[in-house]
Amino acid sequence: MRILVDSNRYQDFCEGEPQAVHVIRRAAEIMIPFIVLGELRAGFACGRRSYKNEQTLTRFLNSPRVKQLFADEDTTHQYARLFRQLRKQGTPIPTNDLWIAALALQHDLLLFTRDNHFDHLPQLPVI
């Protein structure tokens, strides 16, 4: 199983939430997009345990199963298609999450998230 981990599920994993731990341990390949890294680090910067959180993230990123995922030109086309679809449906989602969805679809990944607004994208497999 190849997954893209959203920030809320990464946090769940770090807190030992059983489903998050199970899914992440079972995954053959774990993608973490640059947007999620930005969200996490923004949270770290505002918190009291930024150094500890950064160390934990670094250990996670150093796992051979974890790869960082970046946007490219194909991602921008996927983003535009999704933006149009959601606008037409009248169901916009936050910009960061739209980028996350575009990356997951582009790379044929299961999105591991707790955010239910991704349900507005039936073509996006979510766990």
Residue ranges and their predicted role:
Residues 1, 101, 105-127:
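Acidic, PIN/NYN-like endoribonuclease modules and their adjacent C-terminal/linker elements
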Residues 1-35, 45-59:
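Short, well-structured N-terminal submotif of metal-dependent ribonuclease cores
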Residues 6-7, 40, 79, 104:
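Generic structural signal for small/hydrophobic residues in well-ordered secondary structure
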Residues 29, 65-67, 125:
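Conserved beta-strand segments of alpha/beta enzyme cores
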